[in-house]
Regions:
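Conserved glycine-rich cofactor-binding loop
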Residues: 15
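Active-site helix of classical SDR
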Residues: 105, 140
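Residue(s) in the substrate-gating loop at a strand-loop-helix junction
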Residues: 124
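Substrate-binding pocket helix/loop in short-chain dehydrogenase/reductase
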Residues: 81-82, 89-91
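C-terminal helical subdomain
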Residues: 164-165, 180-216
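Conserved NAD(P)H cofactor-binding loop of Rossmann-fold oxidoreductase domains
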Residues: 73-78
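Active-site loop immediately N-terminal to the catalytic Tyr-X3-Lys motif
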Residues: 83, 131-135
Length: 216
């Protein structure tokens, strides 16, 4: 088991519908949590920027003197037929959902190695199944999810634990904040607080992944 009390964790996307409850659950278990995102609140870090991960490291070391864990809960979505989707929108999703998390991991892993910490990414159920009218979004999430097993093996040599979490549709409000298109009707999703608890349980247990079928 991983001790979470007193550890310094940066949650990227901490103001989001899933990032906020994850941050709250970590705090409830005694972690020192810093929120990172395009507007902070504690660290300004935009995953579209290759320097975002370095900003996370600087922010954590500058305020707490250490970094023990990073949770990436950031993400953007768009809806619509692929043929009708603006290429700029596709690029935006891959920057935020796939390239950005890779750049983030690249920057934070050396510092996490010093504390034998962890890096956790939230990819989601769409990494397991592609849906019509969400093709670029599904592809971007599948890309980062597919990278995690290989990264886990690389990070193990550094003493860093890497995890990939793929919760089913959750009531985060993300569909209502799409950067393009209109969301189709979705069935009722999971409770974000329950999903956050399952994710933090998995972090504490050093689980390498939690597939969509493993969320209650």
């Amino acid at each position: 088991m991983r001790e979470l009390t007193g550890v310094v964790v940066v949650v990227v996307g901490a103001s989001g519908g899933l990032g906020a409850p994850i941050a709250a659950e970590l705090r409830r278990r005694g972690s020192i949590v810093l929120g990172a995102g395009r507007s902070g609140p504690d660290i300004v870090a935009d995953l579209r920027d290759v320097d975002a991960g370095h900003a996370v490291v600087r922010g954590a070391l500058g305020t707490q003197g250490r970094l023990d864990g990073v949770v990436n809960a950031a993400g953007i979505v768009a809806f619509g037929d692929l043929v009708a989707t603006d290429p700029v929108v596709i690029e935006e999703m891959f920057l935020t959902n796939a390239l950005g998390p890779l750049w983030l991991a690249q920057a934070v892993l050396p510092t996490l190695a010093e504390s034998k910490g962890f890096f956790a990414n939230i990819s989601g159920v769409v990494a397991e199944q592609s849906l019509a009218n969400m093709v670029p979004y599904c592809a971007s999430k599948a890309a980062i999810s597919h990278a995690m097993p290989g990264l886990r093996r690389e990070a193990r040599r550094l003493g860093v634990h890497v995890a990939d979490f793929r919760p089913p549709h959750t009531e985060t409000g993300l569909a209502g904040r799409a950067i393009a298109g209109t969301a189709p009707p979705f069935p009722q999703g999971l409770d974000p607080d329950a999903v956050a608890r399952r994710i933090v349980d998995a972090i504490a247990a050093n689980e390498p992944e939690v597939a969509s079928s493993a969320f209650d």
